[in-house]
């Protein structure tokens, strides 16, 4: 059959050589070649056209060589209810051919798929009209996606297929400033739309997918020719190197706690201090809703900085994720309140919530129940003022509040190692506080008295924190102020902990009652 006599508007996806004028054809369904087919899903065939539809016949005696494709392709179409699209990939070109098990390859790139539609088929057919997909390097590049953000890949950079944005980001990170800190839990989603939201998680994912510095000059090292299969030692070397780089990124500038002197630990705590947070002061006179809205917005902003501050404490990131979350959920309001006391220590009768939000005691009368909390904050601040609290002492005290905030038992046996690290870290911060007090020049007896006075004030901070949490929960239940984001998560965690303690307390009381009944019945039986 002559191709010139076929209908002009027919876009056949069949690959053929432009120099040939006759293309042998055979009837029957075919499938678009794909390097990835999900084995766990079934696909039904949907015919787009057939010889009967386009009104031409096929010679029965035409010879078709092996590997030829048919003229009536049936497209693999997902069955109803299946949401995963079919992957359409061109065959790899000889020029850019890669070993199937190359250490540079990443299996995650197979997860990226193209949706099947008529436009895709037309583009595929038009692209193969004059060149075979087997020998077209451009068709291979079109079928690859960035292993980091899932955007279209511009090439093979630093050992993986990546886009220009992730390539430039990784280049900047390995050449310059890369001590990024995740404001959340190091589990941010990195995709095309959110790749710029968290630099720390983006760099972590770069290392996870296999980006390495040694792969930056791949095109200049003869990789354009077909490479031989690497041996197993080469595989292990590349994988171990990528893993080491990933561990180095997740622990940026991490110092071994055992080698830190008290002075170095204090300096690290000083560098970890969060910045001042600004919040717009509501218009006067204050109302219950306006004041609570300002305080909750401020608390939510400070919580983000508090998490970053905790991650910068040497040894905190070595704890298990369970212990990290548990400590932050238990002490978040204590940490915020002791920071409020430090800002207010030079302003008697004032509470410096923020540089642009300064309140006195009388302004708290507009909110029901908050006046008692203001009095507790002012009294504890006055006691710190009498002791002439120093800035380095404040840094150590705040870190001790975080590390000593939770006394709940470990959830599993594997948490024992994390608990041991937590105890070691708390002892190191306590030694730093003792060192700071010793440098003040007072006698040994006065040093012991001062240390005891500072530690006794922590119970007052905890009491004020409990009152504040209870008041905030009441305001939330009364719908006085909406609570969102991190602040809502902290309150929910406090509520869940309270429910668990109530359950355990009721169970304990029932056990005591049953034991008392058994004890009273035994003498009667005798």
Curated annotation (Swiss-Prot):
Pfam families according to UniProt: ERbeta_N, Hormone_recep, zf-C4
Give the GO cellular component terms, alphabetically: chromatin; nucleus
The record's keywords, sorted A to Z, are: Activator, DNA-binding, Lipid-binding, Metal-binding, Nucleus, Phosphoprotein, Receptor, Steroid-binding, Transcription, Transcription regulation, Zinc, Zinc-finger
Choose any GO biological process term that the UniProt entry carries and state it: estrogen receptor signaling pathway
Query: What GO terms are given for molecular function?
Result: estrogen response element binding; nuclear estrogen receptor activity; nuclear receptor activity; steroid binding; zinc ion binding
Q: What is known of its domains?
A: Composed of three domains: a modulating N-terminal domain, a DNA-binding domain and a C-terminal ligand-binding domain.
Q: What does this protein do?
A: Nuclear hormone receptor. Binds estrogens with an affinity similar to that of ESR1/ER-alpha, and activates expression of reporter genes containing estrogen response elements (ERE) in an estrogen-dependent manner.
Q: What is the protein's quaternary organization?
A: Binds DNA as a homodimer. Can form a heterodimer with ESR1. Interacts with NCOA1, NCOA3, NCOA5 and NCOA6 coactivators, leading to a strong increase of transcription of target genes. Interacts with UBE1C and AKAP13. Interacts with DNTTIP2. Interacts with CCDC62 in the presence of estradiol/E2; this interaction seems to enhance the transcription of target genes. Interacts with DNAAF4. Interacts with PRMT2. Interacts with CCAR2 (via N-terminus) in a ligand-independent manner. Interacts with RBM39, in the presence of estradiol (E2). Interacts with STUB1/CHIP.
Q: What is this protein called?
A: Estrogen receptor beta
């Amino acid at each position: 059959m002559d191709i010139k006599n076929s209908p002009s508007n027919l876009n056949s996806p069949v690959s053929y050589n432009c120099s040939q004028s006759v293309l042998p054809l055979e009837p029957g369904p075919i499938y678009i070649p794909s390097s990835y087919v999900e084995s766990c899903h079934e696909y039904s065939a949907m015919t787009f056209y057939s010889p009967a539809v386009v009104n031409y016949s096929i010679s029965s005696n035409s010879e078709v060589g092996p590997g030829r494709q048919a003229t009536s392709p049936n497209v693999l179409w997902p069955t109803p209810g299946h949401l995963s699209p079919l992957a359409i990939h061109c065959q790899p070109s000889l020029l850019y051919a890669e070993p199937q098990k190359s250490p540079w390859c990443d299996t995650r790139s197979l997860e990226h798929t193209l949706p099947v539609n008529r436009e895709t088929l037309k583009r595929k057919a038009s692209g193969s009209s004059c060149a075979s997909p087997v020998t077209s390097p451009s068709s291979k590049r079109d079928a690859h996606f960035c292993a980091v953000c899932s955007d279209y890949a511009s090439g093979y950079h630093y050992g993986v297929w990546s886009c220009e944005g992730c390539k430039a980001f990784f280049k900047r990170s390995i050449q310059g400033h890369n001590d990024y800190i995740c404001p959340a839990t190091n589990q941010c989603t990195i995709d095309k739309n959110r790749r710029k939201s968290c630099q720390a998680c983006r760099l972590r994912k770069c290392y996870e997918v296999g980006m390495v510095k040694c792969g930056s000059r791949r095109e200049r090292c003869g990789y354009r020719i077909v490479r031989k299969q690497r041996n197993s030692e080469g595989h292990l070397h590349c994988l171990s190197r990528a893993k080491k780089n990933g561990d180095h990124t997740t622990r940026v500038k991490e110092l071994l706690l055992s080698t830190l002197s008290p002075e170095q630990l204090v300096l690290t705590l000083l560098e970890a201090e969060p910045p001042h947070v600004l919040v717009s002061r509501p218009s006067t006179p204050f109302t219950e809703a306006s004041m609570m809205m300002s305080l909750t917005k401020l608390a939510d902003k400070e919580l983000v900085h508090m998490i970053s501050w905790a991650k910068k404490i040497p040894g905190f990131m070595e704890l298990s994720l369970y212990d990290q979350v548990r400590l932050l959920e238990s002490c978040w309001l204590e940490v915020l309140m002791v920071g409020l006391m430090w800002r207010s220590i030079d302003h008697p009768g004032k509470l410096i919530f923020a540089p642009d939000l300064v309140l006195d005691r009388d302004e708290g009368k507009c909110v029901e129940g908050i006046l008692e909390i203001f009095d507790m904050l002012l009294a504890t601040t006055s006691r710190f003022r009498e002791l002439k609290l120093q800035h380095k002492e404040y840094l150590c005290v705040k870190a001790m509040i975080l590390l000593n905030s939770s006394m709940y038992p470990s959830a599993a046996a594997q948490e024992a190692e994390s608990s041991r690290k937590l105890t070691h870290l708390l002892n190191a911060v306590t030694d730093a506080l003792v060192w700071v007090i010793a440098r003040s020049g007072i006698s040994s007896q006065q040093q012991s008295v001062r240390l005891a006075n500072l530690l006794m004030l922590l119970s007052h901070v905890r009491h004020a924190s409990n009152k504040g949490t209870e008041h905030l929960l009441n305001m939330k239940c009364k719908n006085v102020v909406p609570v969102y984001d991190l602040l809502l998560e902290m309150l929910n965690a406090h509520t869940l902990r309270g429910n668990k303690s109530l359950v355990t307390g009721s169970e304990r009381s029932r056990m005591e009652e049953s034991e008392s009944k058994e004890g009273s019945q035994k003498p009667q039986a005798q």
